[in-house]
Amino acid sequence: MKKISFILMLVALTILCPSLTFAQLQHSEAFKAKYKLKELVILSRHNIRSPISANGSTLGKMTPHQWTNWSAAGSELTLRGGVLETEMGQFFRKWTIDEGLFKDNYVPNIDEVNLYANSMQRCIATAQYFSSGFMPVANLRINHRYVPSKMDPIFFPRITKNSEAFRTEAMKQINEMGGKDGLVGINKDLKDSYAIISKVLDMKESDAYKKGEIKDFVDNDTKIIFELNQEPSMKGSLKTANSASDAFILQYYEEPDAMKAAFGHKLSLDEWTKIAKIKDVYGDVLFTAPIVAVNVAHPLLQYMYDELNTDSRKFTFLCGHDSNIASVDAALGVEEYSLPNSIEKKTPIGSKLVFEKWVDNAGKTYVAVNLVYQSTDQLKQMSLLDLQHAPQVYSLKLKGLTQNADGLYSFEDVNNRFMQALRAYDEIK
């Protein structure tokens, strides 16, 4: 009876979540007989960091409470983040060995493996921890351009074309996210999230609120700013709430006591998800409008295209930020998605956009596109990962492209999609 119930549960999950494949990276023997893994290109978000600003900043003034005593300096990778990333590296080690891409304890030559991180401490450290789990005896070099911490142009999601025509089209596309009410509509959709985060902050009890320095979150004060050679930015309630959302998410992962993480409030998982929604929306607004995405992601798209087309390469690990994954996804036309088992629904901490190159017995090359991430429970519990206890895997769909019966895109189609995104940048006036 238990076995039948389990099978029925799996069937139900397949029907309700057709895009979710819990074991996408572990293939059947029939699949393995048909395809061989040739290469992986991974774009990773750094793992858990401390907030960029906390006590003493605007973020600190928003609440009468003290934020967590972090195990790292501001914006740097925490001890927990290092452990979690090592576990993810160990999982990819087990999987690539199982698929025959590498042998156990393999030491690659300089052309086979490329680990490249943005020159921010949290990115370099994430790549270092990943490499320790992935190839523990290989002493892999982490490539980064500058002494920490400085943004590398490859990973810097900045506007490099900023004409009036660009700004007009960008704002048109951003406003469409909010329907007929535009930016106001985007903020209206966050009404519940704003209410919850204000309550958890006990914002009205803060000295800054009582002095009028901090105000209630409203729906009509968001302003988007585009400046040449700078990241898209904003002013207003959404920006202010995002800084608190970011800090709460990190504090929830870092602090074992969920009530302590919520400053003594008992929150449901749904309420934590609504807090995280603010950050998800903030990222969407700034980085996923199509014309903005192809603008800010252009250098990274070119680099990833080159890696996918380097014959000697077997494994590429690029470590950047949530804005990198969000903009690359949008530029490539990834269909809208919402991740299960995570309070962050788009680009969870430590998540990885994975392009898998497979070659069939006839020599034809295919690509699978997945988002690999640790569930909220796995992050909080620091669960060990292996082939029997895998991270979450979500199959991403590319608009207008057709997968074969095995869920793979033709390599030509994926290459062409990269080229379309690169040409779209050239077409910005």
Where are these regions (language model features)?
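Signature for phosphate-centric chemistry
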Residues: 24-112, 118-316, 320-429
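Bacterial N-terminal signal peptides that target proteins for export
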Residues: 1-9
